[in-house]
Regions:
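Membrane-spanning alpha-helical segments of multipass transporters and channels
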Residues: 35-266, 270-272
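Short, membrane-interfacial amphipathic segments enriched in basic
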Residues: 5-25, 215-222
Length: 276
């Protein structure tokens, strides 16, 4: 009996279906799995909504102010919006590991679909839920803090936050991929993510970071560029006006003008900086 070339090629394939069919069916299956797990979905959405209300109310109206203190409040409001991702990631990882265990026990031995298809399906299904949950967080956070009424400013902020949703979810899944269980995945993620948060220049200014970390980890941290872009968007075209209690009175010595005294002070500061 002769076998055609096409039939022979099909017999030589590792999987019964091509990559596109595998991915389509795997994505559909994971969507159904998520839909049948309302505890995971509701906890994700609830945490985003409550987090947005809590952080937004904590920094109420700070985005509309232009004092020196309000700039710091804007910075920490932005930073706190990113810190929430640690809790969301630790919700995500056990679900991912349960799906992975099922794949390794049943799907991989039976050659239903490949490891790449499994990873892509998990990442794809997380995206719409994270975008929806991130929007639930962003609306109260942005408008309660009053970062700006302009549509361009709001749209840019929302877009950057949606990119961040995809980033932290994929990062958490990548860590869970190499972890044997959810507990170790949580420890690994917290350890690695702490580097991203600590060396982004918010908790400690870049100039005060140790030289070793400042020269590479500060620039490597995605938080550095994300916070910089969001803060640049919030303070663009806004004039900073210090409040009276934020100004320091500088008494001048007798016989010198304010200009002369400040010139001498600047020279002294420059010399000290040069020695340092």
């Amino acid at each position: 009996m002769e076998i055609s070339t096409e039939s022979s090629a099909r017999l030589d394939r590792e999987y019964a279906q091509p990559f596109s069919v595998q991915l389509k069916e795997a994505v559909h299956r994971v969507f159904l799995s998520y839909w049948r797990n309302p505890t995971y979905i509701s906890s994700k959405l609830f945490l985003n909504l409550v987090g947005g209300l809590f952080i937004g109310s904590s920094f109420w109206g700070q985005g509309d102010k232009t004092s020196n203190a309000s700039l710091q409040n804007k910075l920490f409001a932005t930073f706190m919006s990113l810190v929430l991702s640690t809790s969301l990631s630790q919700q995500l990882q056990p679900e991912f590991i349960n799906q992975r265990n099922l794949f390794e026990v049943r799907e991989r031995p039976s050659k239903l679909y490949s490891w790449v298809v499994f990873l892509l399906s998990q990442a794809i299904v997380e995206i719409p839920w994270n975008l929806f949950g991130g929007t639930l967080f962003w609306i109260p956070w942005y408008y309660m803090a009053q970062f700006g009424r302009e549509s361009s400013r709001a749209g840019f902020s929302w877009g950057m936050y949606m990119i961040f949703q995809i980033y932290f979810a994929s990062f958490a899944q990548a860590v869970a991929t190499v972890a044997p269980n959810a507990m170790i995945a949580s420890v690994l993620f917290s350890t690695l993510f702490s580097f991203v948060m600590v060396f982004c220049g918010v908790i400690q200014p870049p100039r005060q970071l140790p030289y070793f970390w400042r020269e590479w980890m500060f620039y490597l941290s995605p938080f550095t560029w994300l916070i910089e872009s969001m803060m640049g968007n919030f303070i663009h075209d806004k004039v900073v006006r210090c409040l009276p209690d934020e100004l320091n009175d500088v008494p001048t010595p007798p016989g010198t003008s304010c200009e002369q005294h400040m010139d001498l002070s600047l020279i002294h500061i420059s010399e000290r900086a040069g020695k340092a």
